[in-house]
From Swiss-Prot:
The encoding gene: rps7
UniProt keyword list: Chloroplast, Plastid, Ribonucleoprotein, Ribosomal protein, RNA-binding, rRNA-binding
SUPFAM superfamilies: Ribosomal protein S7
InterPro entries: Ribosomal_uS7, Ribosomal_uS7_bac/org-type, Ribosomal_uS7_CS, Ribosomal_uS7_dom, Ribosomal_uS7_dom_sf
GO biological process: translation
Subunit structure: Part of the 30S ribosomal subunit.
Role description: One of the primary rRNA binding proteins, it binds directly to 16S rRNA where it nucleates assembly of the head domain of the 30S subunit.
Keyword match Aminoacyl-tRNA synthetase: no
Official protein name in the record: Small ribosomal subunit protein uS7c
């Protein structure tokens, strides 16, 4: 009996993706602060783009989601970086993690403005999270010869 897909929807947007993002923003159990950060970021997106922020969020996560990832395998004393395909849920989780990591590294005053600008950049296929996905795909392409070691 799998309990994995038991993600609840958030109270305002009624969306599971928003709740997944809030749970990744969460630090030290302060969920209300995480919600406030994300909702402020969504308001910034609505103010700057005049689009539905949920649409921008979905588009950003879709753009950042990787198809393959690199795993390290040890075969006969040597280590190989083996490209492996990943499921959509794992890819989505990676995309959320990369988006938040890129927004935390971004210069700016508060995390809400940094994450809103990173989400808008990712929706337009630019930004550090997109760079991370392209780097992972490039690495997988370079190590395609070791794909048989899966």
């Amino acid at each position: 009996m799998s309990r994995r897909d038991d993600t609840k929807a958030d109270p305002i947007y009624r969306n599971r993706l928003v709740n997944m993002l809030v749970n990744r923003i969460l630090k030290h159990g302060k969920k209300s602060l995480a919600y406030r950060i994300l909702y402020n970021a969504m308001m910034n997106i609505r103010r700057e783009t005049k689009y539905n922020p949920l649409f921008i969020l979905r588009q950003a996560i879709r753009q950042v989601t990787p198809n393959v990832t690199i795993e390290t395998r040890r075969v006969g004393g040597s280590t190989y970086r083996v490209p492996t395909e990943i499921e959509s849920t794992q890819g989505k989780a990676l995309a959320i993690r990369w988006l938040l990591e890129a927004s935390r590294k971004r210069p700016g005053r508060n995390i809400a403005s940094k994450s809103s600008s990173e989400l808008m950049d990712a929706a337009e296929n630019s930004g550090n999270a997109i760079r991370k996905r392209e780097e992972t795909h490039r690495m997988a392409e370079a190590n395609r010869a070791f794909a048989h070691l899966r």
